[in-house]
């Protein structure tokens, strides 16, 4: 039986939740396949004050409604035909979230490769890649994590958590450079990881 995480998606800061999600096991159970992978990269989006956040300045549309729900709600949006998986944080009405940017595949790896038409680290080393690999779509938008087909359970512990500015956030004043991206240092499945930066598995997991 899977063991669920004890992550509190409401009381800690969104930045802290983004850190806590690293190493956790993301599981998607479809009617035909079980997919899972360890989360290795996340980004925090801090709500109405964050110029890079969809809910900046209190923006609220039907597409964004899931962001305004209670922490632990799944928020899936589409960007350039790619689905992006987020976990909403904080209390209802405080629209913050963590974007899941990359995972290390564990279960269903063969089918993941078929879904992506890719192999190796390119299968899940990006937010749109992992959702396609794991068949995560807008159908999951608005559900609560661990109460349906999408779960997050205990996994591994990162040796070192690295921090950087978020990816692809231009022209957002001070928010462009804010260090709100978190990743497992040296992990090959982190997006944009250079070969010279990749560590041995014993070095990036405890």
Task: Please state what every model-predicted region is.
Residues 1-206:
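Conserved, well-structured core segments that form or line functional sites
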